[in-house]
Amino acid sequence: MESADSTGKGSIEQSESQRQSQMDRLDREEAFYQFVNNLNEDDYRLMRDNNLLGTPGEITKEELLRRLQQIKEGPPQPSTEETRGDSVSTGGDPAEDSSNGDSIIDWLNSVRQTGNTTRSGQRGNQSWRAVSRTNPNSGDFRFSLEINVNRTSGNPSMPSLDQSAEMPGAEDMEVSSQGEAENEPEPIPIATRSAPAEVTVEEAPIQRGQRRARSRSPDQRRTRARTDRSRSPLHHAVDPPIRRAPHSSSQTVDTSNTEEAEGSSRTRHHVSSQVQNSSSSNETEGSSRTRQHIPARQQVLGTEGQSQSTVHLSNPETRSSSQTPQTDSSTNAETTGTGQRPPTIVLDLQVRRVRPGDYRQRDSIANRTRSRSQTPNNTVTYESERGGFRRTFSRSERAGVRTYVSTIRIPIRRILNTGLSETTSVAIQTMLRQIMTGFGELSYFMYNDNDTDPNNPTAVSPTAAVPGEAQNNANAEVRAPSAEPTEPVAPVETDEGSNVSTTATRREGRNSRGAVTFEESGSLPFLSLAQFFLLNEDDDDQPRGLTKEQIDNLSTRNFGENDALKTCSVCITEYTEGNKLRKLPCSHEYHIHCIDRWLSENSTCPICRRAVLVASNRESIV
């Protein structure tokens, strides 16, 4: 009897405990709904975008208030002086920036969830700013990178040619979206550093009276010695067609050696690309060959105060009409055979380096006059398409501030719609290698400038190797760092009929010149972007949810006392007066926090399974 009584008491206590637990949960749910209903639009989005709302009934109202207050205040940011002092004390070693890798990954991963974010900071002489914006109607996503480097604020004891001091900082990202901007439907989290990029360059012969940039390593000196002996028909003002090396499986690369005068000496500029000033250059529409217009020389005395050296890599069928690659990439629409623009990734990478001395006087009349009289107006344009990948490069300098811009446009086509023979993973990896190739070329711009003595007014700064034609069967190959070097090579068919292999593995081509190996800093954000665009094969076939921007575009309302009694189909809870509801195009309504969480992982209505957005407005990466 005693055991039976104890068992009965135990069951009663257990049932009472369960009932109390259920009551507490109901109270927490009611408090949760009241908390959400009282939030303004900005606070609600802030908590939703940072996944702070949790599940109704599992978190107290006090905890929600604490989370809201904490996310509003934000983590304490280190002062600029402390950050600058830390950079100087560590000698500006890029390896020190690796600690910021996790925050970069988190930020990039949140782009997919938040749609719009802003971030900025400074470390030593490197400042950066990051903004992410998405167009909810078209799903357009534009990714831009801007890095500002003030060489005068670094450690004065560092040598001017020190790579770690010259290269841009760790996490300088600026993301902007425009209605007409091309689209990167869904950013993917990045991983670790990329492998170093290798660039094999054939330079034009150095002419008498010119000074060659100082080499950093014996390997580079040997390379330049070999390339100096090679002859390139860059001095003829003719338009040769593209040549392909017979023993090379990769697209051959033309040599461009653009010298820049920074003192009183005059330099000549022999460029193997199409000159933007010569806008009358004829390009055959629909032709599989891209013609380059090579001027015998360019004017040394520029007519404008701002000198630009712009190298454009773009679709030959869509010529660029602007000298600003960012404008070009955002205003030119890329179309498919059916006339519809496929989703496209747009990456704008911008690096600004400030030269010592000129920066302090960059606004002075004397400096503007010196810049106008001594800096040539050498604008160079090159247009090409590699399997649909458009790239634009530019370099400009004004009053000691040198700017490099690399714009890459990558159309992301669906396998089923375009009939591509590649699998999804191979297509994604091909896109990755194309992106990294462009980053490697941009880095080579800065690498050549690092070889130039900034204190030498007559030092020559050659530009980066630009894909084009091969001279004398000598290949100048631009290779990109691959996030996974063990992956098989994925060649890309080009308009010229040649294959481009952009892996980081060394190619033992018989006609290749000595490689100029550029050990790129792993702290550079656009090198860490390798796996940012490398998708999981399993994720490619899974349905994706909507972005926060697209969700926010759906209509909302408050449940009134005169409304018919209804129940949210997600949480199975009846609506009460004041509840915020979100209405889908199919007319079904749900609690705003319930349906928002659903739509972050799904794109259909939970009841009727209809698509919330039409296919053309949804974000898709394949």
From Swiss-Prot:
Residues 1-26, 67-386, 473-514 are annotated as: Disordered. GO terms for molecular function: DNA-binding transcription factor binding; identical protein binding; transcription coregulator binding; ubiquitin protein ligase activity; ubiquitin-protein transferase activity; zinc ion binding. Residues 216-242, 355-365 have a biased composition (Basic and acidic residues). SMART domains: RING. Pathway: Protein modification; protein ubiquitination. Pfam families: zf-RING_2. Disulfide bonds: none annotated. Shows overlapping expression with lhx1/lim1 and ldb1 in the gastrula mesoderm, and expression overlaps with ldb1 throughout early embryogenesis. After gastrulation, expression is gradually restricted to tissues originated from the ectoderm, the neuroectoderm, neural crest and epidermis, and subsequently to the neural tube as well as the head and tailbud region. Belongs to the RNF12 family. Forms homodimers through the C-terminal region. The N-terminus interacts with the homeobox of LIM/homeobox factor lhx1/lim1, with lhx3/lim3 and lhx5/lim5, and with the N-terminus of ldb1. This is E3 ubiquitin-protein ligase RNF12-A. It comes from Xenopus laevis (African clawed frog).
